[in-house]
Amino acid sequence: MAAIARRQVTAGLALLVPSLALAQMPGISSGAGPAPWRKIPSITVVWFADDERVRIVREAVAYWNRLFGEIGTPFRLGPVGYAAGTIPADQLKAISDQVLGGGARPDVPVNIDQMPGDIVVALSEGDFISFGMRWPPREKALVAIKSNRRYPLDLGNVERNVVAHELGHAIGLRHNSDPTMLMCGRPAPCRPDAFAAAADRFFPLLDGEKAALRAMYPIGWPAR
């Protein structure tokens, strides 16, 4: 894909040392989570090849940017870059397990902080619960997506909505409890298999979530 800037990450991403970090803890109601971004965040997809999974990330970014335009906010997700490599599945699983277990949020892991891009999207072959988390003071976020060969990401329409959902956390939204909406999640009983459908489509946001985004990123939001 010509639109994706190809950047090679040196020093072997597969050798990155696992470190614990806690994602934004899910909330039971819709609305804004952490502090808003102070700039348009660039995105780096970490994966082995410029393939179908990268295309899904680009489509999810385009979905969010269309939505921002529709609700009248100047905020956008920035350009999508590509880094050939991987973050070890055991590292991502350890972070995912900590997210579910709760605990205090540590500083951003050095290996994530040093990666290109403000939002790092890790497409993994591992089996863990996908997650999205932010470190607002560092203007950094990590979105980790489990293998699309494992249930439920192997179901039609699920992976694209999981990617969009986790990007929603990186943008600043929490979970809600409506299984017909994109941001439904724990502690509500809805799970990613609720996204399954024969035709590709992105699930919508609640009106309250759209209002929260407009409050986080108003007309005068300073895009720097």
Residues covered by each model-derived region:
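Metzincin-family zinc-dependent endopeptidase catalytic domain
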Residues: D51-A170, R174
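Hydrophobic membrane-targeting alpha-helices
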Residues: V17-A21
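N-terminal secretory signal peptides and thylakoid transit peptides that target proteins
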Residues: A2-L16
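Residue-level signal for beta-strand positions within conserved beta-sheet cores that form or flank
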Residues: P41, T73, D178-P179
